[in-house]
Regions:
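Juxtamembrane transmembrane-helix termini in multi-pass membrane transport proteins
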Residues: 27-92, 151-170
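Selected transmembrane alpha-helices and immediately adjacent juxtamembrane segments
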Residues: 121-149, 155
């Protein structure tokens, strides 16, 4: 009888542990996938993508530029993710869902505003740090206060998953920027920028509406 009870207790505990593990895995996947998609969309036509085109056209060395973008993004988004995770401990999930929804809708409107490179980023392009160093400096500066950095803060605060969000936002940045680096400015003028921006803006508004109603968030 005692042996049977112990077996049942172990079975119940095992099932609960399995369910908890599955839920945690689902949350990690959700944070990673949503972060990847959101940032990849936000990066379309962004000043950092323009910067990738400028650096690729000037230096014509894709590999050190790609590595520079990766390092700058990891450092910048790690800080943003840490801030977001900390903010997430201060407010309720309902408030964070609303904040994320507003962020998505705001990014949808923001993405319609054309981005240009400012003087500080242009100066960073002319540093004597080499291709890799110039890319790290320029990209890090360009990301400060950018919509993808703000998105990282909001996503980390919403999902409470630092590594999943930072990995996702970094992958999203690379998905958007690596093709731009490889192609350089060779085909940039042929892209229907306004159409692409419009589609991305609509998708962000849809994501914002989904977040408001708790669909998938």
């Amino acid at each position: 009888m005692i042996h049977s009870c112990r077996y049942r207790v172990r079975l119940v505990v095992g099932r609960r542990s399995f369910i908890t593990a599955r839920e945690n895995h689902h949350n990690v996947d959700q944070a990673f996938l949503i972060s990847t998609g959101a940032v990849a969309l936000a990066e379309i036509g962004d000043k950092t993508q323009l910067l990738s085109l400028v650096l690729a056209a000037r230096y014509r060395k894709p590999l050190p530029i790609i590595l520079g973008v990766l390092v700058a993004t990891l450092v910048n988004h790690a800080g943003a993710g840490a801030l977001g995770a900390w903010l997430g401990t201060l407010v309720t999930p309902a408030i964070m869902r609303w904040a994320l929804a507003v962020s998505f809708i705001g990014m949808g409107l923001w993405i319609l505003v054309p981005d240009t490179l400012d003087e500080d980023e242009a100066k960073a392009n002319r540093t004597r740090l080499g291709v890799f160093g110039a890319t790290v400096v320029a990209f890090f500066l360009a990301e400060m206060g950018d919509k993808t950095q703000i998105a990282t803060v909001a996503l980390a605060a919403r999902f409470h998953d630092f590594f999943g969000v930072v990995a996702g936002t970094t992958l999203g940045m690379m998905i958007a920027n690596v093709p731009a680096i490889i192609l350089g400015d060779r085909f940039a003028h042929r892209l229907p920028t306004k159409v692409v921006h419009g589609i991305a803006a609509v998708m962000f508004v849809v994501l914002g509406a989904m977040a408001l109603f708790g669909v998938g968030f």
